[in-house]
Amino acid sequence: MDIPDNPMKKLVASGASFIARTHSTQVKHMTEMFRRAIQHPGFSVIEVLSECPVFYKGAFDDGNPRKGGEFEIIDEKTSDGTPEDNEKHDVTSETAAFALADIQYPGKFGVFYQKERPSKNDLEGNLIKTSREKSNNADARKLIEERFKGMR
């Protein structure tokens, strides 16, 4: 028997810059997580938990009470300087996100990690711009053709 994977820990380690968890029965919360992920410039991932109708027959039948424990929302730091704020979750800390990911299933819901940094597209754009400046805006096609001529 092996230890099950922890997708949230893997996401923190992978370098995703927005990581959140929500539940399919909490539509307002899920919508807010999707909104924040869409507005985040960079790689965003949301883990959406849901009752499984395969292993839990009747999970979505009308009037059937939901199972699976509490829906505990992460209390995010607001940086207002109050002592209470220091006890809250810092979404910019990978260490804090890793600790949240360690909480027993189903854990807490909300934003685990959010860090602003240049996206892949921004980094590529800057690389292309810098390269063009270094080559005095030379025609890329001509440079490639010249390079291949030298290989014949």
Spans of features found by a protein language model:
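Short, well-ordered loop/turn elements at secondary-structure boundaries
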Residues: 39-41, 105-106
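Flexible, low-complexity linker and terminal segments
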Residues: 52-152
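Conserved thiamine diphosphate
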Residues: 1-36
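Residue-level detector of structured alpha->beta connecting loops
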Residues: 15, 41-42
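Generic beta-sheet signal
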Residues: 42-46, 109-111
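Hydrophobic pocket-lining "lid/loop/helix" segments that shape and contact the acyl-thioester
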Residues: 31-32, 40, 51
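Short, conserved beta-strand edge motifs with alternating hydrophobic and charged residues
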Residues: 19-22, 45-49
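Conserved beta-strand edge residues that scaffold enzyme active sites
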Residues: 25, 51-52
